[in-house]
A protein has these predicted regions:
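Conserved N-terminal catalytic core of the sugar/cofactor nucleotidyltransferase
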Residues: 1-47, 51, 56-58
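Short, conserved catalytic or adaptor-binding loops enriched in Gly and charged residues
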Residues: 7-13, 88-90, 146-147
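Short coil/turn connectors at secondary-structure junctions
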Residues: 12-15, 39-42, 66-70, 82, ...
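Conserved beta-strand termini and adjacent loop/short-helix elements that scaffold enzyme active sites
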Residues: 19-21, 73, 156-158
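Catalytic-core segments of class I nucleotidyltransferases/pyrophosphorylases
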Residues: 44, 60, 64, 92-168
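Active-site glycine-centered loops adjacent to acidic/histidine catalytic or metal-binding residues
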Residues: 49, 76, 167
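Conserved donor-nucleotide/metal-binding helix-loop-beta segment in metal-dependent transferases, i.e.
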Residues: 52-83
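Ligand/cofactor pocket segment of small-molecule handling proteins
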Residues: 78, 82-94, 99
Length: 168
């Protein structure tokens, strides 16, 4: 239905390229499929089940003008065990200590929302991932590995309205 509606994008003043993920192997797998298309450019992954009231202009400017290898958006939630979570490093303000997928005992209530600002460095990380217990290549694990290998990951917080429509 998406391709049917948007087509090649010309009716909307844009050019759309479709890249298909033939099996549900996780977000990191889907990102990896785009490697040749992206080349050496910084890029944004915006999961279709996320709705954000604020536009991405300020976040995009922050990321494109930085030397960060990734930037994630965080939002406080009441039920953090249902989301990928970021634990901030209290000893180093502005730094992330750990990123994890749907922990049973979350160390924070900061959900990693489904909008990721990335550089091509993520592809080498994804190439070395193993499938999770769910059989997926997890974006949270890729981001955590990117960070643990000494790459710079920034974050910003979403204070306005945000909804993950894929999470009841």
């Amino acid at each position: 239905k998406v391709k049917e509606y948007y087509g090649d994008g010309s009716n909307f003043g844009v050019k759309i390229t479709y890249i298909y993920q033939d099996q549900p192997k996780g977000i990191s797998h889907a990102i990896r499929l785009c490697k040749d298309f992206i080349g050496n450019d910084k890029f944004i992954v915006y999961l279709g089940d996320n709705v954000l009231r604020k536009d991405l202009t300020d976040y995009t400017k922050k990321f494109t003008s930085s030397d960060s290898d990734a930037m994630i958006l965080l939002c406080e939630v009441d039920d953090p065990q249902r989301f990928g979570i970021a634990q901030l490093d209290l000893d180093n303000p502005g730094k992330i200590k750990k990123i994890m997928e749907k922990p049973k005992d979350p160390p924070s209530n900061l959900a990693v929302i489904g909008i990721y600002f990335l550089t091509p460095k993520i592809f080498d990380i994804i190439d070395n991932l193993k499938p999770s217990w769910r059989g997926e290549y997890e974006i949270t694990e890729a981001l955590d590995n990117l960070m643990n290998q000494g790459n710079k990951i920034e974050y910003d917080t979403v204070t306005g309205w945000w909804k993950d429509t894929g999470t009841p």
